């Protein structure tokens, strides 16, 4: 059986009296895209730094690929894009990518070949001989992305990779991440952008205040939350809406009625009572002649799951500024 790409068991990191990472455990199979999500200060970046041996855990165990521990040997199998970008501003773009390739063990000719290929892949070919400082922030970020991938690592670790990218370049990055997955390699990243995570992740781990809140395959998590019975409703007119009121007020059918989410174009959402199913509620409405234009079991977005598990206040903060 193939060993996982990464395993964390009870990992703890303290800074003085502050516990930044508190007993976090998760396991990442090979060949998937895995996202670490959480509010600001949750411990995302600290976790990635421990995996990369930039800082050491105070307790717990980290195992990389075939039983490797964080350190020099494991580093040869890892490509890392840190949150704090760092390139040599006065070097030519192609030279800096070649340089990082050679640092990771490539022969000069191979490093030069791969650097050129990555520049073309990322739409930077015409900038190859420009100095890094001549590039925009987003373009520099793509250059650093290339430096993390030039040796074709088995495990790619990206800290806030979409920060600062416009929609076009964000799409390019998503495409590259998908190519890495299709090649059988593994991608681990942190992000505060739930919409990006939902587009690329196979599995996620949500952490808050240093503790793991939940983890698992994204599809399974969404299915589990959908099973809690949230239904979006829209009615043909005010008369139908009024006719539905006593049915939606029946505690045997509906546990909670709430306003529809913004831009959802529903009249309301209802959370079903414990022993109720969507067909049972639909039958009750139709049986009373309620004219319905929409009856939809809500499959939650990743953002909605995040809000449910972490809280609206933290989720709003996460949308407003990059997380760590």
Regions found by a protein language model. Give the residues of each.
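Non-catalytic surface loops within mature trypsin-like serine protease
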Residues: 30, 66, 126, 235-237, ...
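Generic beta-strand hydrophobic packing signal
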Residues: 11, 256-257, 295
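Non-catalytic alpha-helical coupling and interface elements of nucleotide-dependent molecular machines
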Residues: 102-105, 226, 230, 310-315
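C-terminal coupling/interaction segments
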Residues: 273-324
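ABC transporter nucleotide-binding domains
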Residues: 3-6, 13-209, 214
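ABC transporter nucleotide-binding domain
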Residues: 174-272
